[in-house]
A protein has these predicted regions:
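Nucleotide-activated donor-binding/catalytic signature segment of Leloir-type glycosyltransferases, i.e.
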Residues: 256-278
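N-terminal subdomain of nucleotide-sugar transferases
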Residues: 1-52, 57-58, 392-395
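Short alpha-helical donor nucleotide-sugar binding micro-motif in glycosyltransferases
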Residues: 154, 282-287
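Conserved acidic donor-binding segment of nucleotide-sugar-dependent glycosyltransferases
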Residues: 327-339, 346-351
Length: 395
């Protein structure tokens, strides 16, 4: 079976979607010896990189985000030519925009199933916040249109994959009829408890003895709710000075707020990028508490990875990633506000975090593994391929 993935959410410094795709390539290499993989992504120049049964096509595309280094894949003719040449058995699209529609068009021409992976809940993460500037009536109309768009696009796919039960229920309520829930995973060889380097990492960051190290990993952007995190930390600095140190790993439009806060305190460290999973795992393990302010996450891969490393998570209740939290959420914020998040961090800081972390690591490693994820996903692929072959034979 030959699988082709298409996405625009891919760059030298991108996170969850890229991790998922690379883990899939690794799974095929180690476990699916009769399968092939093709990946089509935007990049600085057009090129092909082949490695065994994996091929990565990069298509020259313009930059749309300099911090995240995302690019818009506009050369759809090149995409069509690659798909026509490769003739995949299954196409998976991780794009709700022009690339997603092109995948459907080519899939129909090749008579193969197109699977949509709903990685980004864009109507809530992007559309609603922009529409709110126009007032309540306009917001209601825009959201109604965005739900209709999601319904029209994804009902044309053979299946729509989502990473959480709650998000799956949302899409079903919107009228998407082909939803399949598939949790993501962790690599237990990399993301595991191991405190051998933690003290050295903490010293390199300037974390004082007795301080609790808070960690955030992700983009600094509105859709990630990082402004709430920074204001919450500002509150902690005022109310409980020098008790916490915050490490932020990531970049984005909200970096200006972060830099301003850095000028006011020595208890804030910033690393713009960390693309090495092993290095990232070291930061996860060195932290006492992972702070996840996002309320529109479709899964929360970073939260799962840090738990697998033995570090508990605090955040805001009610997001789509609640089901991957492997410990109780008693201390979590009950509303999306800086004060509520600051109080939640304080409450968690008074608990036995190491015990919570060890328990969470055991659960994360037992329930979430990439081989298990891809075993299930490839069953879906084979089911859809067989269905399409039967339909094509009957025509």
């Amino acid at each position: 079976m030959k699988i082709c993935d298409l996405t625009q959410f891919y760059s030298p410094v991108s996170g969850g979607v890229k991790r998922y795709l690379h883990e899939k390539i690794g799974y095929i290499d180690r476990h699916a010896h009769r399968d092939e993989h093709v990946l089509i992504v935007p990049g600085a120049k057009t090129k092909l990189k082949a490695n065994g049964r994996s091929r990565v096509y990069t298509i020259r595309s313009p930059v749309v985000s300099r911090t995240a280094q995302y690019r818009a894949l506009l050369n759809l003719r090149a995409v069509e030519e690659i798909l026509d040449r490769e003739r995949p058995d299954v196409i998976e699209s991780a794009d709700p925009y022009q690339l997603g529609w092109k995948a459907l068009t080519v899939g129909r021409a090749l008579a193969v199933p197109v699977v949509g992976f709903y990685h980004s809940h864009f109507p809530e993460a992007y559309v609603r916040k922009s529409a709110m500037l126009l007032g309540k009536t306009a917001t209601h109309r825009v959201m109604k249109l965005s739900r209709a768009y999601v319904r029209k696009l994804y009902n044309q796919h053979a299946a729509t994959i989502v990473a959480s039960d709650l998000l799956g229920r949302v899409l079903r309520d919107w009228g998407v009829h082909n939803v399949r829930v598939l949790s993501l995973g962790v690599n237990p060889e990399i993301f595991r408890p191991d405190g051998s380097e933690s003290e050295a990492i903490r010293r390199s960051l300037g974390v004082r003895s007795g301080q609790k190290l808070l960690l955030y990993v992700g983009r600094l952007a509105k859709e990630k709710n990082t402004a709430t995190l920074l204001r919450a930390f500002k509150t902690l600095e005022r109310c409980r000075p020098n008790e916490f140190h915050l490490l932020v790993i990531g970049d984005g439009p909200d970096r200006t707020q972060l830099r301003k806060l850095q000028l006011r305190t020595d208890n804030l460290s910033w690393i713009r990028y960390c693309t090495d999973p092993c290095e990232l795992a070291g930061f996860y393990r060195a932290a006492d508490l992972f702070v996840h302010p996002g309320v529109q996450e479709t899964f929360g891969l970073a939260a799962l990875e840090c738990q697998a490393c033995g570090t508990p998570v605090v955040g805001i209740r009610g997001s789509y990633m609640d089901n991957v939290i492997c410990h109780d959420q008693e201390s979590w914020a009950v509303e999306n506000s800086p004060d509520a998040l600051a109080n939640a961090i304080e409450d968690c800081g008074d608990r036995k975090l190491s015990v919570m972390g060890r328990n969470a690591a055991r659960v994360a490693r037992s329930l979430y593994s990439w081989p298990r994820v891809f075993d299930e996903l490839f069953c879906i692929y084979r089911e859809l391929r067989s269905k399409y072959r039967r339909l094509n034979a009957e025509r």
